[in-house]
Structures are given as structure tokens and as C-alpha cells.
């Protein structure tokens, strides 16, 4: 009798294993949700929709974008952190996944253990801009003024803790130059005042500033990217500025695709392979290029390394400066 019971348990366990394996083999067989934890229309939302549009063709299922804004992305991110790790609930996020919990505090999750990186998606550099008639011609000029007259030169950003703000603080920390940072609620409001001559300089995302630059309303000084961009071939990078402290400087807003932690390896592999197809598709590449962004897939390990670098370079600076929301 005991032998029969034992055999029954073994058979039941094998059946369960076979069922689980079969379920994973069928993945995906129902709609997938991609969380964009910010309001519609922003960089994260647009990125999520471009990905969803092509991912549905690659995977053969409906892919929906869900916007849950609030707490600078932490509310929507927490929804995914608490979801089943079955590949049907995904998250598009950025550097802010690491930075925002430090700035706002009391994050409902630990990003290091709550999420599974899947692939890098795209990156957009920041650009330092001034008015066309500004005497500041180069990044070296900008740094020199910040060193010789600390705090005299004002510079606008798009808000406390944004990538634009972080770029200013990283530059200041690296060079010892000091500026009066004027925090606006969004790039648009900042650009209006810079164009009007109310503030002499601004750090903005290239995709936000490119229209003003092309129209001649703002002049680009330098880019925070690793290399020059096709849209502005004559604009040097921070690394090319001749300022020795900036010789290795690169910092961009990057986005990535994540799932909840503990995703099955085969589901992770299917999603990663699908993302490689999506991000190397000429249509997707062009859609991102039109937004001055560079589409580039990565391995899960490479995306994890990017987050770790953010944690080791930016987070200590945020803590040192005591940056908190206004």
C-alpha cells in the first residue's frame, strides 16, 4: 500500500512538472502587459508603446501598455514588482529606477531584488545649451566660469532629481565648478526662460531640445553621450571638451525592459530574444532615431551592470548632496 502511495506521489509530481513545463513551452499564450509608470506622452510611455507595437508581432499576442503614474514612477513599478514572474507583466523604466528611491525615500521595493532585467532599449543624451548670442562658446568656457566665479552663472534643468539635474551635479562634482541651479517643472518651462534670456544656460534631453536647436533659438555646446550624434555632427561630447576631468564623462537617460524577479529562465530567454528582434528591426530603429534616441538591445547581465554603475556613481552623489524633492 505504501509503495502504491509513493508511486502515486511520484506520478503526481511528474505530472505537475510536465504541466509547468508545457505551460512555459506555450508562453506566451495570452496578452502581455507593459507598465509605463509615468503619465502618457513622456519618454517612458512613448518607448513602451514603440516596443509594444512591434513585440506583439514578434510574440504573436496582444501587448498592452498600462500607465500608472505617481510617486515618480514608484507606484507603477511596485505593481510589477508584486506581479507573478510569469512573463505577462513587464516594466519599462530608466535610470530613475535606481535614483528615485534615494531622492524620495520609502520605496516599497528594493530594485536590486525586485526586478529581473531583460534588455536595454534606448538611450538619449543630455545637451548643454545657451542662447545663440551667448559669450559661452565651449564647455571649457562654461567650466572656467563656474570655477572662477562660483555660483554666479545660473543654469536651468527640468526638476530636482531629473537626469538633467544629475548631469549638472556630476559635471560640477567632477570639475569643481559651481553654478546656481534653477529647477523648473519640466523642460518646456525651462527652455522658454532660457530662450527669453532669463537664464543663460540649460541642460536638457536632446529629444526635448533638438527642435529649438534646429530652429536657431538655442545653441548646443556639448553632449553627454559617448559619441557625437548624427543630428548634430558638429557638436562635441563632454569627453571632447578638453577639460581633463571630463575625459571619461558619459551619462544618458537609458530605458530598459524588466520583469518581476525569479522569472523562469526559458521565459526570460524568449523575451530577450524577442527584444533583440524588436530593437534591430529597421522600423523600430527609425522610430527611435526620429526621437534622437539610439535603439540598442543588451543581455540581461549588461542591463544589470548599467544599474549597478548608476548605483555606484550617481547614488553616492545624490546622498552627499542630500537631494530631495521640492
Across the structure, where does each feature detected by a protein language model lie?
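Bacterial N-terminal signal peptides that target proteins for export
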Residues: 1-10
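Bacterial N-terminal signal peptides
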Residues: 9-17
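Sec/Tat signal peptide C-region and signal peptidase I cleavage site
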Residues: 17-23
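N-terminal (or domain-start) structured segment
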Residues: 23-113, 152, 176-205, 212, ...
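An extracytoplasmic/periplasmic, membrane-proximal ligand-sensing/linker region
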Residues: 29-31, 214, 265-326
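Hinge/capping helix and adjacent helix->loop/strand transition within the periplasmic-binding protein
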Residues: 82-88, 102-189, 238-240, 254-287
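Beta->alpha turn/N-cap motifs
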Residues: 92-97, 157, 167, 187, ...
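C-terminal lobe and pocket-closing loops
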Residues: 123, 209-280, 309-312
Amino acid at each position: 500500500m505504501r509503495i502504491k502511495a509513493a508511486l502515486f506521489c511520484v506520478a503526481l509530481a511528474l505530472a505537475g512538472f510536465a504541466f509547468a513545463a508545457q505551460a512555459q513551452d506555450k508562453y506566451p499564450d495570452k496578452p502581455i502587459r507593459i507598465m509605463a509608470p509615468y503619465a502618457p506622452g513622456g519618454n517612458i510611455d512613448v518607448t513602451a508603446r514603440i516596443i509594444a507595437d512591434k513585440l506583439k508581432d514578434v510574440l504573436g499576442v496582444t501587448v498592452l501598455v498600462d500607465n500608472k503614474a505617481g510617486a515618480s514612477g514608484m507606484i507603477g513599478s511596485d505593481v510589477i514588482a508584486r506581479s507573478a514572474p510569469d512573463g505577462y507583466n513587464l516594466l519599462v523604466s530608466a535610470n530613475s529606477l535606481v535614483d528615485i528611491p534615494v531622492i524620495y525615500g520609502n520605496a516599497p521595493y528594493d530594485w536590486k531584488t525586485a526586478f529581473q532585467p531583460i534588455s536595454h532599449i534606448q538611450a538619449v543624451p543630455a545637451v548643454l545649451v545657451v542662447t545663440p548670442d551667448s559669450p559661452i562658446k565651449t564647455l571649457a568656457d562654461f567650466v572656467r566660469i563656474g570655477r572662477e566665479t562660483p555660483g554666479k552663472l545660473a543654469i536651468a534643468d527640468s526638476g530636482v532629481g531629473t537626469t538633467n539635474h544629475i548631469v549638472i551635479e556630476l559635471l560640477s562634482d567632477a570639475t569643481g565648478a559651481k553654478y546656481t541651479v534653477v529647477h523648473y517643472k519640466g523642460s518646456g518651462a525651462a527652455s522658454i526662460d532660457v530662450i527669453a534670456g532669463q537664464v543663460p544656460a540649460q541642460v536638457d534631453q536632446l529629444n526635448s531640445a533638438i527642435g529649438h536647436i534646429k530652429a536657431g533659438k538655442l545653441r548646443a555646446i556639448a553632449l553627454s553621450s559617448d559619441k557625437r550624434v548624427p543630428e548634430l555632427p558638429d557638436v562635441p561630447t563632454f569627453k571632447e571638451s578638453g577639460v581633463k576631468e571630463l575625459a571619461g564623462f558619459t551619462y544618458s537617460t537609458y530605458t530598459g525592459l524588466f520583469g518581476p524577479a525569479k522569472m523562469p529562465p526559458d521565459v526570460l530567454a524568449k523575451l530577450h530574444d524577442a527584444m533583440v528582434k524588436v530593437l534591430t528591426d529597421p522600423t523600430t530603429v527609425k522610430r527611435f532615431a526620429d526621437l534622437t534616441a539610439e535603439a540598442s538591445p543588451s543581455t540581461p547581465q549588461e542591463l544589470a551592470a548599467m544599474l549597478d554603475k548608476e548605483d555606484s556613481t550617481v547614488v553616492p552623489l545624490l546622498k552627499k548632496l542630500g537631494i530631495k524633492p521640492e
